[in-house]
From Swiss-Prot:
InterPro entries: HAD-like_sf, HAD-SF_hydro_IIB, HAD_sf, PGPase. The lineage of its organism: Archaea, Methanobacteriati, Thermoplasmatota, Thermoplasmata, Thermoplasmatales. GO terms for molecular function: magnesium ion binding; phosphoglycolate phosphatase activity. HAMAP family: GPH_hydrolase_arch. Coiled coil: none annotated. Its EC number is 3.1.3.18. This is Phosphoglycolate phosphatase. Substrate binds at residue 151.
Length: 224
């Protein structure tokens, strides 16, 4: 029996223009009324996911920076990683390549976001790996992370916090940065717009896309 659902935001709750599906919000609220714990896991910053928690009415903790920072129900913020190394790497690479900072970095505490020209991507990825850092593109922005800082880490935190077994957890996501939580022995679902590797890892692939899948996913797993 599933007791907790961890949901990605961009592309999973939102459409191509990053507008949240109002239908998804309705189904989340219905599931919560049945006692399901819902958590959001995003690559975005804590102020953004905090606002989503408040205005949607999310009843579980929410994670920003792909699991690097958590806002809990008691109002506390836990930072699991530091952005000291990632910011230093950005400073170094910005002098050698087109790698450049983005607006949301003023709120990032555990990672670094950036823009970059395609010609420099392979070089920056290789240099980051030498320093024990990870570079990936979420489909919406570039992220520079510490090793181990991912959504799989966040799901493990939720599992421990609520004393759950993996088979009591459902994860829903659409892109490559969601794969770490899809590699755990949990239930997995995705929208029709998901990447091929996410679809292959999923127990259920919805026929709907961009947030409209939440109702079908929740119905499939008997959460409504």
């Amino acid at each position: 029996m599933i007791k907790l659902v961890a949901i990605d935001v961009d592309g999973t709750l939102t459409d191509k223009d990053r507008l949240i599906s109002t239908r998804a919000i309705e189904f989340i609220r219905k599931a919560e009324k049945k006692g399901i714990i819902v958590s959001l896991l995003s690559g975005n910053v804590i102020p953004v996911v905090y606002a989503l928690k408040v205005f949607i009415g999310i009843n579980g903790p929410v994670f920003g920076e792909n699991g690097g920072v958590m806002f809990d129900n008691d109002g506390s913020i836990t930072k699991f990683f530091s952005n000291e190394k990632t910011n230093s790497f950005l400073d170094e690479m910005s002098k050698k390549t087109s790698m450049r900072s983005i607006f949301t970095n003023k709120w990032r505490e555990a990672s670094t976001g950036f823009d970059i020209d395609g010609k420099d991507v392979d070089y920056v990825k290789a240099e980051a790996e030498k320093r024990g850092l990870v570079v990936f593109y979420s489909g919406y922005s570039w992220h520079l992370m510490n090793k181990g800082e991912d959504k799989g880490f966040a799901v493990k935190i939720l599992k421990e916090k609520y004393g759950l077994n993996y088979e009591e957890i459902l994860v829903v996501g659409d892109s490559n940065n969601d794969m770490p939580m899809f590699e755990l022995p949990v239930f997995k679902a995705c929208p029709a717009n998901a990447t091929d590797n996410v679809k292959k890892a999923s127990d259920f692939v919805s026929s709907y896309s961009y947030g409209e899948e939440i109702g079908e996913v929740f119905s499939h797993f008997n959460l409504l």
